[in-house]
């Protein structure tokens, strides 16, 4: 079986699906921003969930076809107790169903863990994930300094500091 992996993320402002080929190091990402109504300052979770439900199949169908070895999906904003947003249910539902039908492992991660892995991948430094390092995470309502340590097939994230006001992460997402 080829070393291809499917990743899915349905955060509050973007629907994303990607294929990563571990043999070649190549990846194909099909993502798109959700529509925020003119004059609005954000999206309600119900509206984000609806848009993901309508768009996710289009993102997946735009990926190159072929077998996948496993599926990864973001299921919550952060890997901490009580971290929850309904918009992640769209991606989780599709990923769980696909993993079951294809008889492949499903890896659930937080959106934050996905950002960290995506940054390492896009920098060509996946080996960073094999050791401890510091990372700045700017996303949505957060600007945080994190201690990242390997944890099996994913990473453990400890918040060392961050902002308590409107963050730079909002500027990036909006």
Where are these regions (language model features)?
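Short acidic/glycine-rich loops and adjacent helix/strand connectors
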Residues: 1-174
